């Protein structure tokens, strides 16, 4: 599967955020989307997810004119959005009930909790009492159950403790084989550790940086240099 973006653009009043973007993402890879704060990473994700309307461009799959649908995309926000008046178990059951016809090979609720390393004592707690990391796990879990072809992750490891962040990285690596994963971050070392391809969002355009040597100082300097270009303009 391929996820094809053609001539995507978005402006807010006089500020151009996305400028005539052409890019193709391929199945089986985790793409690290790097950019400075305010570069437009979240705007790009919101356009891809149809949360906001792009000014122009096409978003298709497999290089054919089949528009990407809501079922194609899972979106994990940097700040988890969950119904805090429900328990973890109630939320998971509600999600599975309303998506019963589309969930492939469903498992029991406890099997899903086990998969995400959510402890038995936490499963019947209200979501408002979950930590940031646990809410993030629940948000990831419903996207895993839905099995979207394209997974957008907007800085999902922000504010997670070391253990939960490592669990999430291992999970993403295990899931990448049959989907396209686009991981937004401004933390370069995290992108280099987790991602197969590095993509810069820079001056409203996407640019691939070849990963010739992940550990080389030269490689990191190239990324930093590209992001610094024009910062004083």
Regions found by a protein language model. Name each.
Residues 34-36:
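The feature captures the beta-strand-to-loop junction immediately N-terminal to the Walker
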Residues 162-164:
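Helix N-cap at the start of a conserved alpha-helix in ABC-type nucleotide-binding domains
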Residues 3-5, 18-20:
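Conserved structural motif at the start of ABC-family nucleotide-binding domains
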Residues 151-155:
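Catalytic Walker B motif of ABC-type/P-loop ATPase nucleotide-binding domains
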Residues 54-69, 208:
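Conserved ABC transporter NBD signature motif
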Residues 49:
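Helix-to-loop junction immediately C-terminal to a conserved catalytic motif
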């Amino acid at each position: 599967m391929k996820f094809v973006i053609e001539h995507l653009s978005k402006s807010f009043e006089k500020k151009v955020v996305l400028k005539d973007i052409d890019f193709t993402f391929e199945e089986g890879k985790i793409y690290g989307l790097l950019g400075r704060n305010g570069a437009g990473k979240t705007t790009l994700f919101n356009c891809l997810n149809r949360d906001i309307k792009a000014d122009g461009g096409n978003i298709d799959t497999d290089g054919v004119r089949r528009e990407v649908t809501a079922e194609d995309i899972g979106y994990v926000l940097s700040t988890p959005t969950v119904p805090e008046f429900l328990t973890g178990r109630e939320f998971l059951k509600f999600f599975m009930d309303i998506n019963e016809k589309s969930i492939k090979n469903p498992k029991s609720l406890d099997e899903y909790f086990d998969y995400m390393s959510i402890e038995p004592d936490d499963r019947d707690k209200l979501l408002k009492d979950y930590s940031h990391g646990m809410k993030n796990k629940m948000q990831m879990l419903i996207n895993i159950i839905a099995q979207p072809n394209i997974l957008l992750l907007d800085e999902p490891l922000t504010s997670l403790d070391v253990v939960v962040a490592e669990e999430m990285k291992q999970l993403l690596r295990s899931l990448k084989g049959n989907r396209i994963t686009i991981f937004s971050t401004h933390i370069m070392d995290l992108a280099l550790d987790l991602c197969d391809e590095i993509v810069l969002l820079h001056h409203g355009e996407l640019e691939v940086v070849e990963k010739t040597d992940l550990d080389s100082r030269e490689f990191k300097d190239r990324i930093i240099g590209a992001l610094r270009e024009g910062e004083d303009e």
